[in-house]
């Protein structure tokens, strides 16, 4: 949007459980980057008031697998390292729905993102990568690594391509009314 000076809102290390409403009201609309590192955030519904967010940093928070997120079509970078994400398929389904244009995702040191550093095997790490790559097809980087074309091909071979869910047709409802 022309004429708006986009800003970066840094609320790191504040022990916040939520973003103060006065800050959302003052800065939400014009914030492109939001850093909430090292807080106690678990609910992301407040992000509805950040419609132009492109980068969100939530490292070291309490974000879980079943987190509620608004639609964030402009978000391209999301860091969620050191959170409480335990169910990969549930969490990734939320990302597919809420963040369709995500290009950079980092989930290191979550139970759902196995790696050598948190006790996972190399095979578990690769399975995690392939699954995420298969579902978030616009992703360019996952954790600390650029996604290679051979990884995309293997992800598609193993998990297939993620297809958008079709909405139920109104036919079922119409049949009930007759």
Where are these regions (language model features)?
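Long, contiguous C-terminal flanking segments immediately downstream of a protein's structured core
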Residues: 1-42, 48, 52-57, 70, ...
């Amino acid at each position: 949007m022309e004429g708006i000076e986009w800003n970066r809102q840094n609320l790191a290390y504040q022990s916040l459980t939520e973003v103060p409403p006065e800050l959302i009201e003052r800065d939400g609309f014009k914030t492109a980057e939001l850093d909430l590192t090292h807080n106690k955030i678990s609910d992301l519904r407040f992000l509805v008031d950040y419609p132009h967010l492109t980068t969100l940093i939530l490292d070291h928070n309490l974000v879980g697998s079943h987190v509620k997120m608004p639609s964030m079509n402009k978000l391209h970078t999301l860091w969620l390292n050191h959170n409480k994400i335990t169910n990969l398929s549930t969490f990734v389904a939320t990302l597919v729905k809420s963040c369709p244009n995500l290009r950079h995702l980092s989930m290191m040191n979550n139970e759902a993102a196995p790696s050598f550093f948190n006790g996972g095997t190399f095979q578990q790490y690769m399975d995690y990568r392939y699954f995420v790559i298969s579902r978030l097809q616009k992703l360019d980087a996952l954790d600390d690594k650029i996604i290679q074309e051979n990884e995309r091909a293997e992800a598609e071979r193993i998990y297939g391509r993620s297809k958008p869910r079709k909405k139920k047709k109104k036919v079922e409802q119409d049949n009930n009314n007759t």
